[in-house]
Amino acid sequence: MLTQEIIIVILAAGKGTRMKSNHPKVLHFLGGKTILEHVIETAQSIKPKKIILVYSDQKKPVLSNIYNIPIQWIIQKKPQGTGHAILLAIKKISDNTEILVLYGDVPFISPVSIKKLQKSKKQSKISLLTAKVKNPNGYGRILRKKGKVISIIEDQDASNEQKNIKEIYSGIFIAQSKDLTRWLKKIDKKNEKQEFYATDIIALAHLEGSFIKTIEPLNYEEILGINNKLQLSNLEKIFQKKQINKLLINGVTIKDPSHFIFRGTLQHGQNVEIDTGVILENNVILGDDVKIGPGCIIRNSSIDSNTNIQAYTIIENSKIGKGCIIGPFAHLRSNTLLDRNVHIGNFVETKDTFIKNESKVKHLSYLGNSEIGSKVNIGAGSITCNYDGANKFKTIIGDNVLVGSNTQLIAPIKIAKNTTIAAGTTVTKDVNTPCLVYNTKEQKYKKNWMRSKKIIKKN
């Protein structure tokens, strides 16, 4: 673990114009989290003395209140480069302490590589995270003389000869705040972008006779940055592959890994099976022997053991008990709670509904703002009419109730246990004792009636 005396500065002030979006670049999503969220979580795992985040928008990003450790937000009102952004952060630091600089658009940097970087700092004034790559386009190049780092040249300022250099700079480094302040105050804006480049401090450190150490990350993917939607898409693929490989190694059966999308966190038991085309988002919990059929979307929900989620079912913000059968083509919306051995069938939609043990809603029904007892059977086409155009009301159905097909339950309403409701009934009043509930509907006949005939148009 790194020392707690380190201060982490995250640079997130870039406008991200190449994303061609109204949203800040670092607030685009990668693997179910914002790009910036990945970086902050890594920083948080190191347990630093402080995290300082430099941003450009007048309004703080929505992440400002998420994390337990406080984040100090510093605005860079005008885009004057990374050197200027780091100097703004250091001005808020009173003592001479170790500074780690991370970037808000480099999401895969690992705590292990940061630990290596900090360890190497003990041997130098400044330690850089670098890598040797086949295609260095877009990155600053490491310039060496007799093996020693003497400076960094940005891609847009590099000569043709310098552009052939394969060793690149990630932008991530560690140095003492006192040294950084001295170097940053000496840099200028004589470059293509007319900005203060943080990379210029390397040449200054060299001129002072400082030894500059370089460390490579565990893998090249850790220093990949995001500047456009293509790069975001490529990193999403990398993220998905890593997450899926972890699940496979940990015993989850994924029948078609190339068509499984996982954006968030997954806790799982043994013998979990996931079919093709499944999407899991946010925080998902799958118990032992859970089976997820093809095309399902499960978002921020928990599913207990031995439950079978059949094809093309959507489950959102819900909790499913043991031994349930859901789907196919069911939609369990927010705050659906199912007890044990509940069956939700084809084209059933639920919301804000609690269904107790062994109840069945097998066809073409809607249950909203409802509490359903145990061993209840809801017939096809039954609807809880919970909304009057302004307010929503609750339907409460007791144990062992049989609701016939095509029934409308006009909320607020309560149905006593052991009641039977005949098919086609509209229930408008509470049923307080067990009985048969039905509407009298006279069946009529019209004799000598004939169907209409098609009119044949003449040309």
UniProtKB/Swiss-Prot annotation:
Supply the SUPFAM superfamilies for this chain: Nucleotide-diphospho-sugar transferases, Trimeric LpxA-like enzymes
Write one Gene Ontology MF term.
magnesium ion binding
Annotated region Linker: the residues are 230-250
GO CC annotation: cytoplasm; membrane
- What residues bind acetyl-CoA, as annotated? 380, 386-387, 405, 423
Concerning InterPro entries, the annotation shows: Bifunctional_GlmU, GlmU-like, GlmU_C_LbH, Hexapep, Hexapep_transf_CS, MobA-like_NTP_Trfase, Nucleotide-diphossugar_trans, Trimer_LpxA-like_sf
Q: For Mg(2+), which residues are the binding ones?
A: 105, 227
Q: Which CDD domains match?
A: GT2_GlmU_N_bac (cd02540), LbH_GlmU_C (cd03353)
Q: Transmembrane segments in this chain: where?
A: none
Its UniProt entry gives the catalysed reaction(s) as: alpha-D-glucosamine 1-phosphate + acetyl-CoA = N-acetyl-alpha-D-glucosamine 1-phosphate + CoA + H(+); N-acetyl-alpha-D-glucosamine 1-phosphate + UTP + H(+) = UDP-N-acetyl-alpha-D-glucosamine + diphosphate
UniProt EC number? 2.7.7.23, 2.3.1.157
Relay the cofactor remark from the entry.
Binds 1 Mg(2+) ion per subunit.
Q: Which positions bind UDP-N-acetyl-alpha-D-glucosamine? A: 11-14, 25, 76, 81-82, 103-105, 140, 154, 227, 333, 351, 366, 377
- Compartments in which it is found: Cytoplasm
Q: What is the required cofactor set for this protein?
A: Mg(2+)
* Keyword set, alphabetical order: Acyltransferase, Cell shape, Cell wall biogenesis/degradation, Cytoplasm, Magnesium, Metal-binding, Multifunctional enzyme, Nucleotidyltransferase, Peptidoglycan synthesis, Repeat, Transferase
Gene Ontology process terms (BP): cell morphogenesis; cell wall organization; lipid A biosynthetic process; peptidoglycan biosynthetic process; regulation of cell shape; UDP-N-acetylglucosamine biosynthetic process
Q: Which proteins does it associate with, and in what oligomeric form?
A: Homotrimer.
Q: What does this protein do?
A: Catalyzes the last two sequential reactions in the de novo biosynthetic pathway for UDP-N-acetylglucosamine (UDP-GlcNAc). The C-terminal domain catalyzes the transfer of acetyl group from acetyl coenzyme A to glucosamine-1-phosphate (GlcN-1-P) to produce N-acetylglucosamine-1-phosphate (GlcNAc-1-P), which is converted into UDP-GlcNAc by the transfer of uridine 5-monophosphate (from uridine 5-triphosphate), a reaction catalyzed by the N-terminal domain.
Record-stated family: In the N-terminal section; belongs to the N-acetylglucosamine-1-phosphate uridyltransferase family.
- What this protein is called in its record is Bifunctional protein GlmU
Task: Specify the species.
Answer: Buchnera aphidicola subsp. Acyrthosiphon pisum (strain APS) (Acyrthosiphon pisum symbiotic bacterium)
Gene name of this polypeptide = glmU
